[in-house]
Amino acid sequence: MKYTFPENFWWGAATSGPQSEGRFNKKHDNVFDHWFDINPELFHNGIGPNIASNFYNSYKEDLAMLKEIGLNSFRTSIQWTRLIKDFETGEPDEDGVRFYNGVIDECLENGIDIIMNLHHFDLPVELYDKYGGWESKHVVELFAKFANT
């Protein structure tokens, strides 16, 4: 049996911010960061979100490799805890904006379609502690504010 794929088929790779970026220059922890802080032994070889695959520092090289092997799409996430400085006001963090703009620009320069996920293991731990996480309508409203940023 022979399979053929359409010429414009999306061949891609996927990851998420908490699983790839590392915690470099992040002002806030998310629940994934917190889980690693309290139970690092549960992570394979103790490797967790502190450095992860270092995408924060190596995204240009990583995305060039995607292009080199013929991939044309990439799914990742925008971390709420990296993009937003103040969760209540929705004020963006300049470094987070710079980073995600850089990732998007690099994808475009390499002919890679980017798909951005807005939530992947990154509920801000302080919103969980203060309001109870997703059970709180206020947290949902704050997420909507983040999504509109």
Question: What residue ranges belong to the model's regions?
Answer:
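N-terminal carbohydrate-binding accessory modules
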Residues: 1-71
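Substrate-binding cleft and catalytic face of glycoside hydrolase catalytic domains
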Residues: 24, 63-149
